[in-house]
Amino acid sequence: MALLFLNELINYLTYKTSSIMYVDVNRGVDKLKVNIDIDISHIPCDLLSILTSDALGERSTDIKGEITKSRLDKKGKILDTNKYEVKEPNFEKMKLEAKNEEGCNLQGYFFVDAVPGSFLLTSAYYGNIVQRLIMEGDLKINAEHKINQISFGETNNRYDIWSNFGKNIAKLSYSLNNVKKNYEKYTSMYQYYLKIVPTKYITFKNVMNDYQYTYNSYAERGIHEMPSMHFRYDLSPITVEY
């Protein structure tokens, strides 16, 4: 009898995870925070820019957020770190970075409108300089990269989500983490399509809002295209609640 009571008590106290889905008409979020940490092995920092666009027709290189760019030597070691900004090109500096076969790490966050859109990591913004460096034999670039992190929303609750709901659920907020794309001949761009789902986690103590996402990707071939990584995203009208 005591054993039966103990089993019932354990079952009662055990936290069980379940989920529901619904359309959240009161979500009221107008901005989406994008968190990135990406190593781009064969594009120097001074030739790399972030371009954003959305379904409303907004296109910009003026990133709202905090991004750092770290110059990487050809072995991946950090040379220095500076605030990301789009600035007037310094040809001689770009040429030196290209000759040294430098790469770049982009890390931090920026905000976009909470509508379908995309962000592009590319050398196309400095296309004329890139073409000149290639013609002069100083630059060999490609779209090889490693995604250390891409996630959406605030990250301060991630540990609590992991602790309360387990890694199989929590990792859905980091679906692209540690994805690596090695160099493939004639591959100019890697396309990623992300479906972002607003997610709400409810515990006995608090309510935590986050975003999960799934993705598909493919390599786009083109000899004359600028090496780029293109992330297209769409926000689901459905909210998942745990």
Where are these regions (language model features)?
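Generic detector of well-ordered alpha-helical segments enriched in charged/polar residues
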Residues: 10, 49, 107, 230-232
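Soluble non-transmembrane domains of integral membrane proteins
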Residues: 28-30, 39-224
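Juxtamembrane amphipathic/hinge helix adjacent to a transmembrane helix
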Residues: 222-242
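Internal alpha-helical transmembrane segments
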Residues: 1-19, 53
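Well-ordered beta-strand positions in beta-sheet-rich domains
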Residues: 20-22, 193, 230-232
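Alpha-helical transmembrane signal-anchor/signal-peptide segments
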Residues: 11-33
